[in-house]
A protein has these predicted regions:
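Phosphate- and other anionic-substrate recognition elements at nucleic-acid/protein interfaces
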Residues: 1-174
Length: 174
């Protein structure tokens, strides 16, 4: 069974594909444009190409976590999620949305400390974990660097967390 992991945003969407336990593809889509709506429209064809190439049976995508703060970011992430969901629906591929804690916790990315829950720390740990498990050389420069490859590592680990749980195909427990 082929499964795909997606870590979506309006600036960079990471993706990964596994065939069984084997990581067979991964990458990032970084669309051009200053407006998030334009970037979103430009992401679509690239994501469709990846789906057509790998033909995943199921997709796991990070859900938008509801938290206090930036309402605009929630609106944008919700739009990104809906847009990508529409693309996957056109291929009739089932999608399951996972909250960050649902895929990070089983992989040991939370260490129980307040420091360990900071975004930059979690992104850095994601890169280290993906590099360790899959023998990759994904890059982490600094918390604010645009050269960080955490979108790719997150997409890989989103899918991998479900392989580890052997959940693909089974309904999510409530």
């Amino acid at each position: 069974m082929k499964i795909m992991g997606i870590d979506a945003s309006s600036t960079a969407t990471g993706w990964s594909v596994f065939d069984g336990n084997n990581l067979i593809g991964y990458g990032i889509i970084k669309p051009d444009g200053s407006d998030w709506r334009d970037r979103l429209v430009h992401q679509g064809p690239y994501l469709a190409q990846v789906i057509q190439k790998y033909k995943p049976d199921k997709i796991y995508m990070e859900d938008v976590p509801l938290k206090k703060g930036n309402a605009k970011a929630l609106v944008i992430l919700g739009a990104v999620q809906g847009f990508i969901y529409g693309i996957t629906a056109s291929f009739e591929i089932p999608v399951e949305f996972l909250l960050p804690s649902e895929w990070r916790s089983p992989l040991g990315l939370y260490d129980g400390t307040r420091e360990g829950t900071k975004r930059a720390e979690l992104k850095h740990k994601s890169i280290l974990k993906a590099n360790e498990i899959f023998g990759l050389n994904l890059v982490w420069v600094s918390p604010s660097s645009k050269k960080n490859e955490d979108d790719i590592s997150d997409a890989i680990l989103i899918a991998y967390s479900q392989i580890k749980k052997k959940r693909f195909g089974r309904p999510k427990s409530q």
